[in-house]
């Protein structure tokens, strides 16, 4: 039996449409805004450490890009790695690397991640693809429900991390409070070992209100012995 929805679906399939519904992808007009950037450097492609940026570079990335990242994130550039234009690729590669280490000690164990919901579906797709079990935790006014998260981390040594979008979290728009950020930074101290915070600060520079809170950085938490 064919329903009207099935018929409508088949109609779209047969229309031969080639639509790109990728979220967050700039249009050509937006990309054209960056055309003048190459002209600004006047053909000088040498980085501050003397590498020709058109050639292969070091593993940590272009120094100028790392310095810019340090400014944007309020982190010492020596703690910054500048990759390609896909942060999601870096996150995936990092978790593949960590998962291999976890599995080396417990090859038959299923590892878990805390996922603050609603959240970014592609974070969750990475977990699904890697066979990482997802534990959903909701929000309160200050961000993720930290009481529930802390209890989970204390109880289960197979919980290895948490996904965080600390500012203007999509789709709810939550910005984590300073107290919540500090409690998140302390989670590795509550876990059995090797707990990671996947800190996807994608909207760090997207404040519409100039009074939006600046977070204490992970680097500062490290220096305080929290992480």
Which residues are covered by each model-predicted region?
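Conserved core of the PLP fold type I
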Residues: 51-193, 204-224
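N-terminal "arm"/small-domain region of PLP-dependent enzymes with the aminotransferase-like
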Residues: 1-60, 64-65, 70-71
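Generic enzyme active-site microenvironment
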Residues: 198-199
């Amino acid at each position: 039996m064919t329903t009207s929805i099935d018929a409508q679906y088949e109609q779209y399939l047969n229309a031969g449409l080639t639509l790109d519904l990728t979220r967050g992808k700039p249009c050509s007009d937006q990309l054209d805004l960056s055309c003048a950037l190459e002209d600004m450097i006047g053909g000088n492609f040498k980085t501050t450490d003397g590498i020709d940026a058109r050639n292969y570079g070091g593993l940590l990335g272009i120094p100028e890009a790392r310095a810019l990242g340090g400014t944007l994130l309020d982190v010492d550039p020596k703690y910054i790695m500048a990759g390609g234009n896909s942060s999601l690729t870096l996150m995936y590669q990092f978790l593949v690397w960590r998962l291999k280490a976890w599995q080396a000690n417990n090859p038959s164990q299923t590892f878990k991640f805390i996922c603050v919901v609603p959240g970014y579906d592609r974070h969750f797709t990475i977990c699904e693809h890697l066979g990482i079990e997802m534990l959903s935790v909701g929000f309160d006014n200050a961000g993720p429900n930290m009481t529930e998260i802390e209890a989970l981390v204390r109880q289960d040594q197979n919980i290895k991390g948490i996904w965080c979008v600390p500012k203007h979290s999509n789709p709810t728009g939550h910005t984590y409070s300073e107290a919540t950020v500090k409690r998140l930074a302390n989670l590795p101290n509550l876990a059995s070992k090797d707990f990671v915070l996947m800190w996807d600060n994608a909207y760090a520079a997207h404040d519409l209100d100039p009074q939006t809170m600046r977070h204490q950085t992970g680097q500062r938490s490290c220096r305080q012995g929290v992480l």
